[in-house]
């Protein structure tokens, strides 16, 4: 959910809304650790790694309200392995960090991913091709929640300008 601040008369001064954002990510089939980063507290550009689009209806709200603050967000990710024979099992997980660079520096090997207390949960999946007899049949789903007040250690993210942004920018504190 996010809080919006109005810039036009005739509308409420602020409004809480829930917006939905969907992104499809394709990784190469290398043996290397691959990471992808999202901004948990931005609706202007949630996709840190690749850039992208805003959640549905964000542009319409941005015509009425000039600032936003993300109070909470949630991610649901489902790995969809390539359907072919000989696919090796893969590890899949998430990490919440104040720096997108932490992902690439901290998780340079699978062992770091599996041993980290900050990655939750490391899942293993394999080939989803039922006819090949290779790999695992079940796809795992990772869900995680972000609460801005808890994560940043503040009473309310609405109290600090570092967590609020113009509708044309990301917050200063990402």
Give each language-model segment a name.
Residues 1-174:
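Capsid-like jelly-roll
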């Amino acid at each position: 959910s996010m809080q919006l601040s109005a810039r036009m008369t005739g509308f409420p001064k602020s409004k809480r809304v829930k917006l939905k954002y969907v992104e499809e990510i394709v990784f190469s089939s290398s043996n290397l650790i691959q990471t992808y980063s999202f901004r948990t507290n931005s609706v202007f550009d949630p996709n840190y790694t690749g850039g992208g689009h805003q959640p549905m209806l964000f542009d319409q709200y941005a015509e009425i309200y000039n600032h936003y603050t993300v109070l909470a967000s949630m991610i649901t990710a489902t790995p969809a392995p390539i359907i072919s024979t000989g696919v090796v099992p893969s590890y899949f997980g998430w990490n919440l960090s104040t720096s997108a660079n932490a992902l690439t520096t901290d998780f340079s090997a699978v062992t770091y991913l599996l041993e980290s207390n900050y990655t939750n949960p490391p899942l293993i999946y394999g080939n989803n091709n039922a006819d090949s007899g290779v790999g695992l049949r079940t796809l795992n789903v990772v869900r995680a929640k972000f609460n801005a007040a808890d994560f940043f250690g503040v009473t309310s993210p609405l109290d600090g300008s570092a967590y609020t942004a113009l509708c044309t920018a990301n917050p200063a504190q990402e």
